């Protein structure tokens, strides 16, 4: 009946939906009712989130010691280390496609322009087992809920999604993600809630060559103002991180107060990144 109601205007029943959802969360799960309860909970949550967008948590962990992996393009690892603050540079370790670092103040790193993303390492990797129940238990026992609360302000559950990067085929991957998400919800007492569209954090599960899984946390609650000049973009626009990488590679050849011409400027992303790296007298762009 919920599937049918989801196609109608059900706003008059939101209170009843919330009460029923609370009852389901308190219901003891058994092998017999687990599948039905999880499906009903997911449908109710999706229906409520369409009408009532959750209030997102505010990231406050800029000075909370954390172990991070800064994702970069291959070959940009050392250049990324070179632009880090001197007080943390020695602690950074280059790895393929990124830089690993344990830092007292993560906020010092969020402004690095050649970084494509920031992953938090909150549990011991790789995990010992790969079954969804074992992985969920490892994630929960590593203190994910407390880890998130320590770095955020705000009440309510944390909505997450799972990015599974393994050798499983598509239909197996979909089932694994669904079961892993439901198990994390159950273990956390629904302080973690799986949502494919309204998530504020992401669990990236990757498989190595030995078939072992590693889990990292990506926080979408961190405000990224590095490329705030980018008001409009088109499909052919250069990605700003790519532009920052190009400028970093050419840094030693850039002159102060130069006249700079980009004959294929597009939306001028490369010109702007060039100016931010070293001041130019004039910028010219044609396309």
Predicted regions and their residues:
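Structural detector for internal amphipathic alpha-helices that build alpha-solenoid repeat scaffolds
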Residues: 1-8, 39-43
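Conserved S-adenosyl-L-methionine
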Residues: 238-287
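Short, surface-exposed recognition loops or helix-turn segments adjacent to catalytic cores
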Residues: 189-204, 260-264
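SAM-dependent Rossmann-like transferase core, predominantly class I methyltransferases
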Residues: 215-253
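Alpha-helical repeat scaffolds
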Residues: 13-23
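C-terminal edge-of-domain segments
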Residues: 202-221
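Non-catalytic nucleic-acid substrate-recognition regions in nucleic-acid-modifying enzymes
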Residues: 49-196
């Amino acid at each position: 009946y919920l599937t049918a109601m989801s196609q109608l205007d059900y706003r008059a029943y939101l209170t009843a939906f919330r009460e029923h959802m609370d009852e389901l969360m308190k219901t003891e799960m058994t092998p017999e009712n687990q599948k039905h309860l999880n499906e009903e909970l997911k449908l109710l949550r999706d229906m409520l989130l369409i009408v009532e967008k959750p209030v997102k948590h505010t990231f406050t962990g800029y000075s909370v010691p954390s172990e991070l992996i800064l994702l970069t393009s291959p070959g940009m690892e050392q250049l990324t280390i070179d632009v880090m603050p001197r007080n943390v540079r020695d602690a950074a370790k280059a790895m393929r496609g990124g830089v690993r670092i344990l830092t007292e103040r993560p906020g010092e790193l969020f402004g690095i322009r050649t970084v494509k993303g920031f992953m938090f390492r909150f549990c011991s990797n790789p995990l010992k087992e790969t079954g969804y129940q074992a992985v969920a238990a490892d994630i929960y026992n590593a203190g994910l809920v407390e880890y998130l609360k320590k770095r955020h302000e705000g009440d309510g559950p944390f909505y997450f999604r799972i990015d599974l990067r393994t050798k499983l085929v598509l239909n197996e991957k979909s089932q694994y993600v669904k079961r892993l998400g439901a198990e994390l919800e159950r273990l956390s007492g629904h302080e973690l809630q799986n949502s494919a569209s309204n998530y504020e954090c992401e669990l990236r599960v990757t498989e190595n060559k030995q078939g072992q899984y590693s889990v990292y946390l990506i926080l979408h609650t961190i405000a990224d103002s590095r490329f705030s000049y980018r008001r409009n973009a088109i499909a052919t626009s250069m990605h700003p991180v790519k532009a920052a990488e190009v400028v970093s590679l050419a840094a030693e050849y850039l002159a102060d107060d130069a006249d700079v011409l980009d004959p294929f400027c597009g939306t001028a992303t490369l010109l702007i990144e060039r100016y931010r790296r070293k001041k130019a007298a004039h910028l010219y762009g044609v396309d």
